[in-house]
Regions:
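Glycine-rich loops and low-complexity Gly/Arg-rich segments
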Residues: 31, 55-58, 78-80, 123-128, ...
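Short, low-complexity, polar/charged sequence segments that are solvent-exposed and flexible
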Residues: 23-27, 50-53, 72-75, 118-122, ...
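A domain-level signal for caspase-like cysteine endopeptidase catalytic cores
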Residues: 1-52, 102, 114
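Short, glycine/charged-enriched secondary-structure capping and boundary segments
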Residues: 19-22, 66-70, 114-117, 138-140
């Protein structure tokens, strides 16, 4: 059985929609409802035992945006506002997982290189700011083609890409 782990970082219903669809298609799904940066570090530094990892979050040119915490709380965690590609390089330890990062700007070359260098089988993310609906539709179509229809990663990506009319999701290998 294919295993998917979702890191949900304040994205509303995206993670719920992906989880329900994935479970319907026979994927074993676990979710971390991220409240602080240590949870991301713990998950992605521990050689996760899953075939697919979905980082369901928000991003910008700085990197993955973290949940806003009060100063007295955020000082207890390794990263505050954002986790950059340089930060990810310090703790990632992946287990040949397919990593999909739905956060805006997650598909910049420097971020992709870090994930690949640290053990991702491949890395998929948008290179700019996709519309939220397009992002969700890409995720659902990719999972459907990859898991349910047994397409290889390249073919599943090619079939899912038109769901985002601006075709911002990029596959890095």
């Amino acid at each position: 059985m294919i295993k998917l782990h979702i890191l949900e970082i304040a994205t509303g219903l995206e993670a719920h929609a992906v989880r329900y669809a994935a479970e319907h298609w026979g994927i074993s799904v676990t979710v971390t409802w991220v409240g602080n940066s240590q949870q991301i570090v713990d998950c992605l530094s521990s050689y996760p035992d899953c075939d697919l990892i979905l980082i369901s979050g928000h991003g910008d040119e700085r990197g993955l945006i973290l949940p806003e915490l009060a100063e007295e709380v955020s000082s207890n965690y390794p990263y505050r506002d954002v986790i950059s590609h340089d930060d990810f390089a310090k703790f990632l330890n992946l287990n040949n997982s397919v990593v999909i990062n739905s956060s805006c700007m997650g598909g910049v070359q420097s971020m992709a290189e870090v994930f690949l260098d640290k053990g991702a089988k491949c890395y998929i993310a948008p290179k700019d700011f996709p519309l939220a609906d397009a992002s969700l539709m890409y995720l659902l179509k990719f999972l459907y083609e990859y898991v349910k229809n047994n397409k290889d990663i390249d073919k599943a990506h090619d079939l899912a890409l038109p769901q985002d009319e601006r075709e911002l999701f990029t596959l890095f290998k």
